[in-house]
Every structure is written in C-alpha cells, then in structure tokens.
Amino acid sequence: MKKVLKWTAYVLGSLILFIMLASWYFSSKFNKEFEKVIDYTPDAIIIPTDSASVDRGRVLSVSCRSCHSVDLGGKVFFNDPSIGTLPASNLTRDKGSETEHYTDQDFVKAIRHGLNKSGNKLMIMPCKSYSHMSDADLGSLIAFLNTLPKVERTFDKRKFTFMSQVMAGAGLFGDMFHYDLIDHDNVKNIPSVIVGNTVEYGSYLAHVQGCNDCHKKDFKGGKSPDPVSPPVPDISQTGSVGKWTSEQFIQTFRTGSTPEGKVLNGEFMPFSGLAAHTDQEITAVYNYIKSLK
C-alpha cells in the first residue's frame, strides 16, 4: 500500500511540475512575442487629398468601427477578469493616444504590416486581411484618418492574467499577431482592382474584409478562430447562401437579417463593413462566392 501511495505521489508531483513548467513556458513565449521590437520600414505610398479618395477611405473605415468605435476614438475591446483588459487604439491622433505621433507611414506600418510605431506586434488587428488592400485604397483610408477630428479618449494599458498569457502562448486564442501571417516582401505596390460586380473585384473585397479569416478559404465555415465565439456558418454553394439570389444577399447586409429570418450578430459577424459598400460591390462578393467550387 505504501508503495502505491509513493508512486501515486510521484506521478502527481511530476504532473504538477510539468504543468507549472509548461505554464511558465507558454506565458514567457507570449510575453516575448508581445515585447519584441521589429525594425521594419514599409515602402511609402501616395496619400491623396481629393474628396473622392477621402470618401472612399470613409467607406473602407467602416470596418474599423467594430473595434475602434464609431468615431474611431477607440474603446475597450474586452475587459474580462479571467482574461484581462485590451483597448482598441484611438486612431484620431489625440494627445496622449497611441497614435498621437503617428505619421502616414506609421499607419501603413500598422494597417498593412501589423506593427505599431515602436515596432511591436499589434494584437488581434486583422492586418492579414488589410495586407491585400491596394496602395490606392490604403492611401484613401489613411487620407480619411487624416481628416478625423481628435477624440479625447484614453485607456488604461493592456494587461492580461497569467492564465490568459498561458492560453495565448499555447495558441488557444488563435493567431494573436497577424504580423507573423503576412509575406511582407510581397505586400507592396499592390495594384487597384477595377470596381465592378466582377468575380475579380469580389475576391479582392472579400479578402480585404477578411471573410475568409472566419469562413475559411473554401467559405464552408467551421470552428471559429476565437474560442469563445460560436461556429462559423457555411456560406459556400453548400450552405444557405448558395440558395440565395444576389438581391437577397444584398438585403442581408442592408438589413442585418437573412432570408431565413436569422438576425446577424454584429459582435461575431461584422457585416457593417461590407454593408457600407454599393450594391454593385456587394454583388461582386456574391458572384465571387458563387464562383467557388
């Protein structure tokens, strides 16, 4: 009996030690990535000043509101005692904000490459999607940001519980740093795609909007990259969208309700970004999805 107890204590002790070491390793791994400074200077792009370009930037910026608030003055992205606190930055260059001293090139670095002004990796920022954005559209987006009135809003620094650091380091929160997912040498001098209801433009817009980040490459959905979010629906030919007309697809984004009567939850399905575009552009995304086999 003593021998059994001895071995049981040995196994339990080893297991506890393993868990402690693994937790320390994953926590350290996360913090190392979080604190790493990357020396990277992106290629400069042309920032237009004409009203048409600024308005195009306004349309593109609607996608940013889900995280950065309607006025783009930032907001607390999440605040959970079990996970921690993470604010989404104030993008208006207000005094004391993370973007106060941002240049146009710093915004290119952040939006296209996932790095802040200091060279730290941005968390949860969907830069992989924005890395598909053409130079012209990215320039228009930054041109619009340059017109924003400053919003006086500051936040406490981001902080994470030890357990959330362990989970993030173990990859349980999905891809936290999109910088690591981007081929930085190939996201430069990106040509524009002619706006129209074509499959080509639909592919461009779907990738910029990040549809495939959640709905997967084949748009068949599945498990969400966010462990606390519900499963992602199939929007390919084999899903409900495959049965919709282009008009129904457009109305879904315009009203936030599907033909089947399901109300879209903007927290998990940020449909407002695509809804800001014209019927022709939304039709292009529909045509692109319908073209997938």
Show where each model-derived region lies.
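C-terminal capping alpha-helices of c-type cytochrome domains
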Residues: M20, D104-R112, S129-R153, S246-T258, ...
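N-terminal type II signal-anchor transmembrane helix
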Residues: K2-K36
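The canonical Cys-X-X-Cys-His
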Residues: G57, S61-V70, F107, L141, ...
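Detector for the c-type heme attachment site
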Residues: C67-G73, R112-H113, N146, C214-K220, ...
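Extended surface/linker regions that mediate inter-domain or inter-protein docking
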Residues: G13, L17, A22-W24, D137-V199, ...
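Sequence context surrounding c-type heme c attachment/ligation sites in exported
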Residues: S51-V62, E200-N212, G221, D226-P231, ...
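Electrostatic cytochrome c docking/interface patches
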Residues: E35-S61, G174-H207
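Gly/Gly-Pro-rich "capping" loops immediately C-terminal to redox-active cysteine motifs
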Residues: D71-D104, K121-S134, F160-D175, K216-I250, ...
